[in-house]
Amino acid sequence: MNTIKDLTVREREVLKFLVEGLSSREIADKLYISINTVQYHRKQLLHKTDSRNVAELIGKAYRFKLIDLD
């Protein structure tokens, strides 16, 4: 698995919102980006963390402390 420094600032923002349970539409609205852009970042996160789905991605986010949970 890649390290946290391999994740972009935007990918970390998207990951934080995914962990909080937001949908792609909600993330797009919060970050003022398109749903397609959110989906691109989700795809990149899955690839960079070798995750098969968002549930696994969220588990790895907690396990490897990929985000600041404050």
Please provide the spans of the model-predicted regions.
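Recognition helix of helix-turn-helix DNA-binding domains
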Residues: 23-56
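Helix-turn-helix DNA-binding segment
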Residues: 2-35
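Residues within well-formed alpha-helices
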Residues: 13, 48-50, 60
